[in-house]
């Protein structure tokens, strides 16, 4: 089954790319939307309208270059929308916001073709899927993203560079977009583009929650310590965070929260100083709000660990979200989980 699914996925991707390149000009005429025209002419200078903080530059020379760059431009927190999907419908029950990158065409295609086909799983509930992107060089071409946005109406892109430390900017900017275009959504699930979401299980879980009440549920990490090793991606110097432990936070691979929490988080984020690790930044804002994240074993943001079998479809039937799947693994697991012939001896409820 794996070779066959791999071939199908590869062929689908090739067809998508060729279609985009061949049909772009005739599908998006010269008189297309102003937003698309502005995007095509946009310069690739991500800090052109925000001057560097030279005081910080002089006091952070001992830090790694990525940290110096973050501190130099941390005050820059207002970036333009380049591509934007339509607003949420009035009866949107669940908004799925997925962090992606421009080059991750294969991941987005796999999601749209599997669990992202929300309508087939919604059971009368209105769902909306949105991918969150920054800007990442000339590949793929800007025109290709314009076509993808036009074709699927699920791309939300801002004019800041794709970078691990800029994931916090995605958090802040998507909160603003939700406040402007998707206030009707009862619940919001955030995830990465390498997660498998069991939509029916998520919908069943949310039936018992009130969107007007504060809550955030996921794979909660407690008593995590800042990493002081300058050679690792998660390094945080004392000058940026002095406490011994981070506040409780949900793993950024995926978590779900209420409409009320999103609204309150937006206000807290606007007042908070940006922090380079997005998961922890959300945890800091939750602590400021007095909201404690709730742990749920159905969120596997570190994947399925041994001795459990990460390829057991019966295990997936009892989970809400599993992190770190390749597009091929996502296709495979979706095909198995949705196969009516699949018989499980017992449901693996978390």
UniProtKB/Swiss-Prot annotation:
Name of the protein described by the UniProt record: N-acetyllactosaminide beta-1,3-N-acetylglucosaminyltransferase 4
GO MF terms held by the record: N-acetyllactosaminide beta-1,3-N-acetylglucosaminyltransferase activity
Keywords, ordered alphabetically: Glycoprotein, Glycosyltransferase, Golgi apparatus, Membrane, Signal-anchor, Transferase, Transmembrane, Transmembrane helix
GO biological process: poly-N-acetyllactosamine biosynthetic process; protein glycosylation
Function: Beta-1,3-N-acetylglucosaminyltransferase involved in the synthesis of poly-N-acetyllactosamine. Has activity for type 2 oligosaccharides.
Transmembrane segment boundaries: 5-25
Signal sequence, renumbered to the chain: none
Reactions performed catalytically: a beta-D-galactosyl-(1->4)-N-acetyl-beta-D-glucosaminyl derivative + UDP-N-acetyl-alpha-D-glucosamine = an N-acetyl-beta-D-glucosaminyl-(1->3)-beta-D-galactosyl-(1->4)-N-acetyl-beta-D-glucosaminyl derivative + UDP + H(+)
Database matches in InterPro entries: Glyco_trans_31
Residue ranges the record marks as coiled coil: none
Subcellular location: Golgi apparatus membrane
Transmembrane helix in keyword set: yes
Organism in which the protein naturally occurs: Mus musculus
Membrane topology: Single-pass type II membrane protein
GO cellular component: a single term: Golgi membrane
Record-listed E.C. numbers: 2.4.1.149, 2.4.1.-
Enzyme type, top EC level: transferase
Cytoplasmic side, ranges: 1-4
Topology, Lumenal side: 26-350
Keyword Membrane: yes
Pathway(s) annotated for this protein in UniProt: Protein modification; protein glycosylation
Protein family according to the UniProt entry: Belongs to the glycosyltransferase 31 family.
Glycan attachment positions: 53, 166
């Amino acid at each position: 089954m794996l070779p066959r699914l791999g071939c199908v996925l590869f062929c689908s991707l090739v067809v998508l790319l060729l279609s985009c390149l061949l049909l772009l000009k005739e599908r998006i005429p010269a008189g297309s939307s102003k937003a698309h025209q502005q995007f095509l002419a946009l310069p690739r200078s991500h800090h052109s309208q925000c001057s560097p903080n030279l005081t910080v530059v002089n006091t952070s020379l001992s830090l790694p270059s990525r940290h110096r760059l973050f501190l130099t431009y941390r005050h820059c927190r207002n970036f333009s929308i380049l591509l934007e999907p339509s607003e949420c419908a009035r009866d949107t029950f669940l908004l799925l916001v997925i962090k992606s990158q421009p080059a991750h065409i294969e991941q987005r295609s796999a999601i749209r073709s599997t669990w992202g086909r929300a309508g087939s799983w919604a059971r009368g509930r209105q769902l909306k899927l949105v991918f969150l992107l920054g800007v990442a060089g000339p590949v793929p071409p800007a025109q290709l993203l314009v076509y993808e946005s036009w074709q699927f109406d699920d791309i939300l892109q801002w004019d800041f560079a794709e970078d691990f430390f800029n994931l916090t900017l995605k958090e802040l900017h998507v909160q603003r977009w939700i406040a402007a275009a998707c206030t009707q959504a009862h619940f919001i699930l955030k995830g990465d583009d390498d997660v498998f979401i069991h939509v029916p299980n998520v919908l069943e879980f949310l039936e018992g929650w009130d969107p007007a009440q504060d809550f955030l549920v996921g794979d909660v990490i407690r008593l995590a310590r800042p990493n002081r090793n300058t050679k690792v991606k998660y390094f945080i110097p004392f000058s940026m965070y002095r406490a011994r432990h981070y506040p409780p936070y949900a793993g950024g691979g995926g978590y779900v929260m209420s409409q009320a929490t999103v609204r309150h988080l937006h206000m807290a984020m606007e007042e908070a100083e940006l922090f380079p690790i997005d998961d922890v930044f959300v945890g800091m804002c939750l602590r400021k709000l007095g909201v404690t994240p709730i742990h749920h074993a159905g969120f596997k943001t570190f994947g399925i660990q041994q001795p459990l079998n990460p390829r057991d479809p019966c295990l997936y039937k009892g989970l809400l979200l599993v992190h770190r799947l390749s597009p091929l693994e996502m296709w495979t697991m979706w095909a198995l989980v949705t196969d009516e012939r699949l018989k499980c001896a017992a449901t693996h409820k978390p």
